[in-house]
Swiss-Prot record:
UniProt GO molecular function: rRNA binding; structural constituent of ribosome
HAMAP family: Ribosomal_uL23_B (MF_01369_B)
Record keywords, A-Z: Ribonucleoprotein, Ribosomal protein, RNA-binding, rRNA-binding
Keyword Transmembrane carried by entry: no
Function: One of the early assembly proteins it binds 23S rRNA. One of the proteins that surrounds the polypeptide exit tunnel on the outside of the ribosome. Forms the main docking site for trigger factor binding to the ribosome.
Family: Belongs to the universal ribosomal protein uL23 family.
Protein name: Large ribosomal subunit protein uL23
GO terms for cellular component: ribonucleoprotein complex; ribosome
Coiled coil: none
Gene from which the chain derives: rplW
Natural source organism: Corynebacterium efficiens (strain DSM 44549 / YS-314 / AJ 12310 / JCM 11189 / NBRC 100395)
InterPro entries: Nucleotide-bd_a/b_plait_sf (IPR012677), Ribosomal_uL23-like (IPR013025), Ribosomal_uL23/eL15/eS24_sf (IPR012678)
Pfam families: Ribosomal_L23
Phylogenetic classification of the source organism: Bacteria, Bacillati, Actinomycetota, Actinomycetes, Mycobacteriales
Subunit and interaction comment: Part of the 50S ribosomal subunit. Contacts protein L29, and trigger factor when it is bound to the ribosome.
GO terms of biological process kind: translation
């Protein structure tokens, strides 16, 4: 397990999609994370950056899409997403209205 000193190297960006907006009402937040980060590192990073208590972390590895261009085929880079559920009674994360990052 590689130790990453800075938690901002683990949490890369919030995911902006209809699904992620809908999940925020249920206290579930979605982030792009480093491909080599594990669930424990993600939990610690979210708690340090946003000052909240995390109940669970679910991760999804997404393979890069194959895309065609004029010169042939290419592949978008693969990503890893983390669905972070906060504990009951924990403060919500104001991702899109504040300058936390």
């Amino acid at each position: 397990m590689a130790t990453i000193a800075n938690p901002r190297d683990i949490i890369l960006a919030p995911v902006v999609s209809e699904k992620s907006y809908g999940l925020m009402e249920q206290n579930v937040y979605t982030f792009f994370v480093a491909r080599d980060a594990n669930k424990t590192q993600i939990k610690i990073a979210v708690e340090e950056i946003f000052g909240v208590k995390v109940a669970s972390v679910n991760t999804v590895n997404r393979e890069g899409k194959r895309k065609r261009s004029r010169s042939g085929f290419g592949v978008r880079k693969a990503t890893k997403r983390a669905y972070v559920t906060l504990r009951e009674g924990s403060d919500s994360i104001d991702i899109f209205n504040g300058s936390v990052a």
